[in-house]
Amino acid sequence: MKNLTKTSILNLKQSSTLVINEKCKELILKGKKVYQFGFGQSPFPVPETIVNTLKKNAHRKEYLPIQGLPELRENISNYLAKRTGNDYPKENILITPGSKEAMLLIHIAFNGEIIIPAPGWVSYEPQAEIGSNKVHWLETTRENNWFPTGKELEKKIKSVGKNKNLILILNSPNNPSGAVCKNLEELAKVAKKYKIMVLSDEIYTDLTFNNEYNSISKFYPELSFITGGLSKWCGAGGWRLGFLAVPKKLTEFLKSLKSLASESYSTVNTPTQYASVEAYAHEHNLYKLKVR
């Protein structure tokens, strides 16, 4: 029989963090003591009020809108407005089964190339390859806290081709380094100069030690996507609830993402969305202080 797998998928391996996680569980079941450094799994329980809201809505079985529960999208819009000062209206929020899926949808829909600072999360490049988007790694140094300088970013854009459709993936606090980007405004100026898009992975941004939520969208809201979710600050990784905030200028692009969502996962599970309304309705300051 001829090869059944597409070339773009043939060399795709399972996510290394998930493989490590499964191996750790296997060893623990055998009585081994394991120090887990592969997977971003919070050791803290989900806040009780959010768990109780999930329980109260466990009976719900209806399909929700493709884009997500309106009340949830409204709460996330307010959450982002408070932290970034920008208006990502609920109409521009897409609820996804984890922020990982939000990023994958972008890669599948996007017609262009991707710039990823190194070190970077293990799934960025494979996701780009699934979307047939060429990846350009941008090396960083300890001197700049493992993030590119404005000059380094500009040099990379010019070498890749400044007239191409480009997305810069920025993750702060960074996985795996844990570092926080201190020169967001500088990077935003370069991105704005060349009109490249930014995919800001903010899954850890609520967990900075100094309680400062720094987002490149504060300086470049026009073309900055934001992804986030419950996995890290809320400890609810297994609930698979994420979101994508799309800038107003890219509303047409959002239509394509919704189409992809409708033909893949349809909608995120209903009880978790109702629980997430509670999650994004309050600050949960005492809980976040504990988990930082």
Predicted regions located by residue number:
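N-terminal small-domain helix-loop-helix segment of the aminotransferase-like
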Residues: N3-P97, A279-H282
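Conserved PLP-anchoring active-site segment centered on the Schiff-base-forming lysine
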Residues: A109-E129
